């Protein structure tokens, strides 16, 4: 069911303050932090992670650590679409968002 949800992803950044909000019919999550500084994030699946976000090579890179594990989420614009790649333990998945009209 969750894989079929078509969420909206709203990213705002003013100076160094970043907010990412993901809204779907199933759930809405949001986190905020300062670029380059670690902060605690409560993820949609209930994990409490230590997260740091930075802009690297034109992409927004979000690195999460929890319970001895880590994952990286990279968001970049490509051909007018938001491409989100998630990597954990050398396994990657990609989700593509189209801009709302």
Swiss-Prot record:
What is the species of this protein?
Answer: Homo sapiens
Signal peptide range: none
Q: Name one GO cellular component term.
A: nucleus
Keywords, alphabetical: Lipid-binding, Transport
Free-text function comment from the UniProt entry:
High specificity for fatty acids.
Q: What is this protein called?
A: Putative fatty acid-binding protein 5-like protein 3
- Domain of life here? Eukaryota
> Record keywords: Transport included?
yes
Q: What is known of its domains?
A: Forms a beta-barrel structure that accommodates the hydrophobic ligand in its interior.
